[in-house]
Curated annotation (Swiss-Prot):
Keywords: DNA integration, DNA recombination, Fimbrium biogenesis, Transcription, Transcription regulation. One of its GO terms (molecular function) is DNA binding. This is Type 1 fimbriae regulatory protein FimE. It comes from Escherichia coli (strain K12). FimE is one of the 2 regulatory proteins which control the phase variation of type 1 fimbriae in E.coli. These proteins mediate the periodic inversion of a 300bp DNA segment that harbors the promoter for the fimbrial structural gene, fimA. FimE switches fimA off. The gene is fimE. GO terms for biological process: chromosome segregation; DNA integration; DNA recombination; resolution of DNA recombination intermediates. InterPro entries: DNA_brk_join_enz, Integrase-like_cat_sf, Integrase_catalytic, Tyrosine_recombinase_XerCD. Gene3D superfamilies: Intergrase catalytic core. The lineage of its organism: Bacteria, Pseudomonadati, Pseudomonadota, Gammaproteobacteria, Enterobacterales. The keyword Transcription applies. Residues 2-184 form the Tyr recombinase domain. Belongs to the 'phage' integrase family.
Amino acid sequence: MSKRRYLTGKEVQAMMQAVCYGATGARDYCLILLAYRHGMRISELLDLHYQDLDLNEGRINIRRLKNGFSTVHPLRFDEREAVERWTQERANWKGADRTDAIFISRRGSRLSRQQAYRIIRDAGIEAGTVTQTHPHMLRHACGYELAERGADTRLIQDYLGHRNIRHTVRYTASNAARFAGLWERNNLINEKLKREEV
């Protein structure tokens, strides 16, 4: 077996719990939640601005990079709550009014890739994940979780903004659950055919 290169849903939950009580807990929780739920690359996440969100309608506009398809995703209730909680806290941060970027540092500038990497790595350590955690693992965790929930490859491709389905197949190809019941279904078909022959 090769070393796992993604996080499980339980590990992501543990990471969010690990960060939520720290000094920057509201920001870090929101950052991890949105990265995971929307399968965002770190650059896409850090490029999010308030104009990309419609909290009333429950939508988030994701501008995909690497020639990916930009998409509009629904924002679930817990995501809206996390954004609202972070936005309230963010308003008290020095220099927060200088930028529309959602994720900022304590100094009021847009959060850097290095800072986001450190937040996610440290959350993984605190949560006791089985592998060293980095931001792209949250994107992979999203793809694998969607496959586990039975989403088909094309839908996952659209959701993650992949232009080429080759990049998406990894999520469904390794999902053993998709084969569950395959023989049972085939046996039912065979039994039906036998009855029709009689």
